Swiss-Prot record:
Disulfide bond residue pairs: none
Family matches, as HAMAP family: Ribosomal_bS16
Highest classification ranks of the organism: Bacteria, Bacillati, Actinomycetota, Actinomycetes, Micrococcales
Superkingdom of the organism of origin: Bacteria
Organism, as annotated: Tropheryma whipplei (strain TW08/27) (Whipple's bacillus)
One Gene Ontology molecular-function label: structural constituent of ribosome
The name this protein goes by in its record: Small ribosomal subunit protein bS16
Gene that this sequence comes from: rpsP
Single biological process term from Gene Ontology: translation
Keywords, sorted A to Z: Ribonucleoprotein, Ribosomal protein
Record-level GO cellular component terms: cytoplasm; small ribosomal subunit
Length: 148
């Protein structure tokens, strides 16, 4: 039985998600699989790639051949280099940052100075650098000038 590591498409129209699976080469793309070894979400920015490295290494060692797309993902995660025998394979996939329950969000994720309940929010009239309605050209009808 020829076994392949390939992508199984799931998701909605124009919102694809893929599972990296081990399947018989004769089955359909989205057909029965032997084992799921990872996930790939190309729509997210940056793309999400997660591969169960020990299981992928096992299937590669017993002769499973990856498709071109699966091979590209295995190279990104460093699993292909590890299978080929490189000593220090490097993964070019960033690990997702998780925020634990007790910790606060990173500084880049925090909102700047929250507005208190009694404070007024700034309006357009508070900004002198923005043009006002009275600065509109005079040849424009009044009903158009009043709209913003």
């Amino acid at each position: 039985m020829a076994v392949r590591i390939r992508l199984k498409r799931i998701g909605k129209v124009k919102r694809p998600f893929y599972r990296i699976v081990v399947a018989d080469s004769r089955t359909k793309r989205d057909g029965k699989v032997i084992e799921q070894v990872g996930k790939y979400h190309p729509v997210q920015n940056p793309s999400f790639i997660e591969i169960d490295s020990p299981r992928a290494q096992y299937w590669l060692s017993v002769g499973a051949k990856p498709t071109q797309q699966a091979l590209a993902l295995l190279k990104l995660t460093g699993d292909w280099a590890r299978f080929c025998g490189e000593e220090n394979p490097v993964s070019r996939v960033e690990q997702p940052v998780s925020i634990e329950a007790g910790k606060s969000a990173p500084k880049s994720c925090r909102r700047s100075a929250p507005v208190a309940a009694g404070e007024a929010t700034p309006t357009v009239s508070d900004r002198p650098d923005l043009p006002s309605v009275s600065d509109a050209p005079q040849d424009v009808p009044e009903d158009v000038r009043g709209q913003a």
